[in-house]
């Protein structure tokens, strides 16, 4: 019975997680809401971080739908597992993805562990993604699912894109494990956003018309460059045109730029109004390499790329095969050939050249709508 399952809902103070909690309550589950207090911007150096308002909004919604509400303090774990990863990556010239790491390490990591330690069967979030049960093959036992108490193979779970393709957030879950997915619930994954807003308004939820957050995971409405300026020292160097080696100016630090970036480089376009784009970084002299934004700009487009730190939600892909990939959030899935080189690395051959594949970012692998896993651009 649904009522036998106790679920802890990660309530961010936004409308998505509010409706997630509401739907689970309506379905008869034993629901408790919790706000993860991961960052409070105590030094006020990075601008607006509305955590206090978010807690109040989440608390108001919990009261409205009649569920218990808690605040779970995970600030130390967030700094150690997400902020440190973020700052270390940028300091090494990479372009990390804090949202994906936050999901793996915090939301479905330490928060999930906290929930299990406090008697919850599962956690739920407001992600636009869908979790489906995959029945085991009774001839070949499902190793990933393990065994039931009676010795029969246990089910495994697959992660599908959200039904609303404009809001799909499966990409951000690319590094989850089967164990993490087993304990996850995504109550709104089948809903289009307008329908979700309608449900929130009809229920009179305090967050029904609250705008969606666009900031860094759990930090708030903060631009990445502002965050980096607060915590990573400037390391100036030359801006160099890759095609002829001409120095065009100076930059404040390579960590402020990523491959494919056009805005904020700090050098004007030419007389034909052609914009410059970042095509690389040269660590030896801290040079930022740029070129005019053309299809033939050196280093801007890649047909082949290597990925490492492979992570699979289900059975690992161990032989060369055709898959689809999402090279960054909101980009469409594109066809590729996956060629494994080891358990943790692979060569990727795209059917068409891809733009701006920055080292440190995540490539998510799909089989149709099913998310298989992901890897990090080398």
Swiss-Prot record:
Cysteines engaged in disulfide bonds, as pairs: 102-217
Entry's Gene Ontology cellular component terms: cytoplasm
GO annotation terms (biological process): tRNA wobble position uridine thiolation
Main location: cytoplasm
Enzyme class per UniProt: transferase
Pfam families xrefs: tRNA_Me_trans, tRNA_Me_trans_C, tRNA_Me_trans_M
Entries under InterPro entries matching the protein: MnmA-like (IPR004506), MnmA-like_C (IPR046885), MnmA-like_central (IPR046884), MnmA-like_central_sf (IPR023382), Rossmann-like_a/b/a_fold (IPR014729)
Protein name (record): tRNA-specific 2-thiouridylase MnmA
Source organism of the structure: Opitutus terrae (strain DSM 11246 / JCM 15787 / PB90-1)
Gene name as annotated: mnmA
């Amino acid at each position: 019975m649904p009522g036998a399952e106790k679920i802890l809902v990660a309530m961010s103070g936004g409308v998505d997680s509010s409706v997630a909690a509401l739907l689970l309550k309506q379905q008869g589950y034993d629901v408790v809401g919790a706000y993860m207090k991961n960052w409070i911007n105590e030094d006020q150096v990075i601008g607006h971080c509305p955590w206090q308002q978010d807690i109040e909004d989440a608390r108001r919604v919990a009261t409205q739908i009649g569920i218990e509400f808690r605040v779970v303090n995970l600030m130390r774990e967030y700094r150690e597992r997400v902020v440190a990863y973020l700052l270390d990556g940028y300091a090494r010239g990479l372009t990390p993805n804090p949202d994906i790491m936050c999901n793996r390490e915090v939301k479905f990591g330490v928060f999930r562990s906290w929930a299990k330690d406090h008697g919850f069967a599962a956690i739920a979030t407001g992600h636009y993604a869908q979790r489906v049960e995959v029945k085991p093959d009774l001839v070949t036992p499902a190793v990933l699912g393990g065994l039931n108490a009676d010795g029969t193979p246990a089910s495994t779970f697959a992660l599908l894109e959200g039904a609303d393709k404009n809001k799909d957030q499966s990409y951000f879950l690319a590094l989850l494990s089967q164990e993490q997915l087993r304990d996850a619930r995504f109550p709104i994954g089948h809903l289009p956003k307008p329908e979700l807003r309608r449900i929130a308004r009809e229920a009179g939820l305090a967050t029904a018309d609250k705008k969606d957050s666009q900031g860094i995971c759990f930090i708030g409405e903060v631009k990445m460059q502002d965050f980096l300026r607060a915590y990573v020292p400037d390391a100036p160097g030359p801006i160099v045109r890759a095609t002829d080696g001409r120095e065009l100016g100076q930059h404040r630090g390579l960590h402020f730029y990523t491959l494919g970036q056009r805005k904020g480089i700090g050098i004007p376009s030419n007389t034909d109004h052609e914009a410059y784009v970042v095509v690389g970084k040269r660590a030896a002299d801290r040079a930022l390499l740029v070129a005019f934004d053309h299809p033939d700009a050196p280093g801007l487009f890649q047909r082949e790329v290597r990925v490492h730190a492979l992570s699979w939600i289900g059975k690992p892909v161990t032989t060369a095969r055709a898959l689809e990939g999402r090279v960054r959030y909101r980009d469409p899935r594109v066809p590729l050939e996956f060629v494994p080189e080891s358990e943790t690395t692979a060569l990727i051959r795209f059917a068409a050249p891809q733009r701006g594949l920055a080292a440190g970012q995540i490539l998510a692998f799909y089989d149709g709508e099913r998310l298989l896993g992901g890897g990090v651009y080398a």
